[in-house]
Amino acid sequence: MCIRDRLYDCFTITVLMTLEDYGFCRPGEAAAFVADGALEHGGRLPFNTSGDLLSETGMPGMQLIMEGVRQMRGTARLQVPGARLCAVSNQGGTMHTHATLLLGN
């Protein structure tokens, strides 16, 4: 099963903190995890393939969901081969509210 990840990326540090909080890497290891290429399109955890907040404009919460749905349908521009499950994550304020949506096909 291929897991896709769609994390709210309002700031770079938010991505690093969320990767650690979700258990994709240990506390303090997110920067090395990213530098190792884990989040690239062909990496272990393809990440935010549509660009999201750091590269795309519009309604950020809906963009995360829309790209997750495209990945599950197999219609994404940067399709992750074998994508079967997608975690869509969003947060508000200074990381004090949080929501997670799991999508599957």
Across the structure, where does each feature detected by a protein language model lie?
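Claisen-condensing/thiolase-fold acyl-transfer catalytic domains that form or cleave C-C bonds
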Residues: 4-105
